[in-house]
Amino acid sequence: MEVYLSENAFIGLLVSALEVYRRECFGILLGHSTPDRVFVEFAVPYQSANRKYREVHIDWKRSQRVEEAVRSTTRWECIGDYHSHSKFGLRRATTQLSNEDKQHFSEGTVGVVVAVNDIRKPRPWSYVKGGTLSGSVNGYSIRIAAYYKSNDHIARAHVVSPYAIGFMEKRQDLFRRSIQ
Ligand SMILES: [Zn+2]
């Protein structure tokens, strides 16, 4: 399974995760899906998410209301959700799903996890082993991983974001040139 992130979705995930760092964000993913590809067009943050440092709980009734609103007003579908993991004390954030993440994972949907940590040196955006997208923004290290649940089994999906790899790399080249 491949999970494509559009420019809007990629920026949405970054802004949403960085805004609340070191707390954790939660939101829904809008887009469309085919049997082996999911296209994420938008990442929409939930303002009502009761953000704690370790876990994010949301009001599930409200979530259903949002899904119905999306279905009746846009051509996109709710294809899954996302949340961030933040560095906690000395423990660095990872993109691994917690037990609670697994419990709340709905069948047939995609779950994106954005891990945010402090970092000293900027790092170009690239794909790392297992299909994770990794890079940095303004002193924060970001890793974006995706999972997909089918037949009651949660598997890792490959994150694909031409925008992140191409455009961000060019930006960093320009930046490097301008400081030399
Ligand atoms: Zn989690």
Residue ranges and their predicted role:
Residues 1-80, 84-180:
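MPN/JAMM (Mov34/JAB) isopeptidase/deubiquitinase module and associated MPN-bearing subunits/adaptors
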